[in-house]
Amino acid sequence: MFHFSGFNMMFPEGRNFHANYKCFSVSMLPGNERTDVEKGGKIIMPPSALDTLTRLNVEYPMLFKLTNVKKSRSSHAGVLEFVADEGKCYLPHWMMENLLLGEGDILNIESVSLPVATFSKFQPHSTDFLDITNPKAVLENALRNFACLTRGDVIAIKYNKKVYELCVLETKPGNAVSIIECDMNVEFEAPVGYKDHSETQASGSGQQGAAGTVGGEIAGATNAILEEVVETFKGSGVRLDGKKKKESQLETPVVKKVLARGVPDYDFQFGLIRFDRNIRPISDRSQEDDAVAGNADASDAESFHGTGFSMKKTRK
């Protein structure tokens, strides 16, 4: 049996990476503006970190645990580039808010190995997220710029020039998971501030039923019904997405038309169809026809009062 101890010395097993850096937001990065870093969940580290990671034989993909020791807050992220100044690292703004970090604070970075994600659940922080037609497709496209997810983090995604914040409520199989080349099921919780109006609609239908019974009891008061003024659509409108409607102040107020309630037919028999028409008796119709004919004869008799003449004289 042969032992290759020298082989193991040439290729040592991977060890963890530990380092402390001064953290800054991406807006402080020298050079051109890096909007792509703000859209994702990856950080920028100095070149010396790459040399150390290579010598330690760290597993790929490179994932890191970020810890703010003073505030006891931690999160996870991937690395985008190794172009930062020595002793500094640059983070997205939303990640610094999660870790309660300020510009120049000390951040502890440690290399970790995370399980591949199988399930995650998100909760939007605004009801405006309901305006998105296909939220799963938008989230899938945004998560391409992320390397991992941590339970409890509030991530920020940008869509149609608007930033949406989502809280990571649940991740499986662990509290922190890798989302690189994974097949992950996604669910959404109701947004913060969203109210379900099904109960209010049910109570409104109950009030309408009660109003119908009361109307049957006062059916005999015809005079009161004629004088009663009805105002249609007294309730307030409700949006399907749960947001409040925008109140627009008009310069000239809209005058509502007042409609008077009509008198119902209380002698109506169920199953009987009536076609009411203005039908005149036959005797009245015949008298009118005779009168019209007499007037026509009289007008014919009174016509041509003069004598007639012939163009051709008759021979005697």
Curated annotation (Swiss-Prot):
<protein>
    <recommendedName>
        <fullName>Ubiquitin fusion degradation protein 1 homolog</fullName>
    </recommendedName>
</protein>
<dbReference type="GO" id="GO:0045879">
    <property type="term" value="P:negative regulation of smoothened signaling pathway"/>
</dbReference>
<dbReference type="Pfam" id="PF24842">
    <property type="entry name" value="UFD1_N2"/>
</dbReference>
<dbReference type="GO" id="GO:0036503">
    <property type="term" value="P:ERAD pathway"/>
</dbReference>
<dbReference type="InterPro" id="IPR004854">
    <property type="entry name" value="Ufd1-like"/>
</dbReference>
<dbReference type="GO" id="GO:0032436">
    <property type="term" value="P:positive regulation of proteasomal ubiquitin-dependent protein catabolic process"/>
</dbReference>
<feature type="region of interest" description="Disordered">
    <location>
        <begin position="284"/>
        <end position="316"/>
    </location>
</feature>
<dbReference type="GO" id="GO:0034098">
    <property type="term" value="C:VCP-NPL4-UFD1 AAA ATPase complex"/>
</dbReference>
<dbReference type="GO" id="GO:0006508">
    <property type="term" value="P:proteolysis"/>
</dbReference>
<comment type="function">
    <text>Functions at a post-ubiquitation step in the ubiquitin fusion degradation (UFD) pathway.</text>
</comment>
<dbReference type="InterPro" id="IPR055417">
    <property type="entry name" value="UFD1_N1"/>
</dbReference>
<dbReference type="GO" id="GO:0043161">
    <property type="term" value="P:proteasome-mediated ubiquitin-dependent protein catabolic process"/>
</dbReference>
<dbReference type="GO" id="GO:0031625">
    <property type="term" value="F:ubiquitin protein ligase binding"/>
</dbReference>
<keyword id="KW-0833">Ubl conjugation pathway</keyword>
<dbReference type="InterPro" id="IPR042299">
    <property type="entry name" value="Ufd1-like_Nn"/>
</dbReference>
<comment type="similarity">
    <text>Belongs to the UFD1 family.</text>
</comment>
<dbReference type="Pfam" id="PF03152">
    <property type="entry name" value="UFD1_N1"/>
</dbReference>
<dbReference type="GO" id="GO:0000502">
    <property type="term" value="C:proteasome complex"/>
</dbReference>
<dbReference type="GO" id="GO:0031593">
    <property type="term" value="F:polyubiquitin modification-dependent protein binding"/>
</dbReference>
<dbReference type="InterPro" id="IPR055418">
    <property type="entry name" value="UFD1_N2"/>
</dbReference>
<dbReference type="GO" id="GO:0098586">
    <property type="term" value="P:cellular response to virus"/>
</dbReference>
<dbReference type="GO" id="GO:0006511">
    <property type="term" value="P:ubiquitin-dependent protein catabolic process"/>
</dbReference>
